[in-house]
Amino acid sequence: MKLIDLDGRVIEVENLDLALLQADDYRHYRVTTPTENDIYRYAYWEDVYQKLLKLKTEQL
């Protein structure tokens, strides 16, 4: 399975369940004073997580 991230890069997903767990962890990381890069990272991991969920529902 593949998905395209916010930067337009193709990501190959070999283990969808593990990828969902990892992306879910990353999307919940927060810092007390987020920089512009941190805010982008929040959006990035939320986007990846949502795309992985879509892949999961398409599998069912």
Model segments located where?
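N-terminal acidic leader/helix
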Residues: 1-32
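Short, charge-rich amphipathic interface segments used for partner binding and complex assembly
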Residues: 24-60
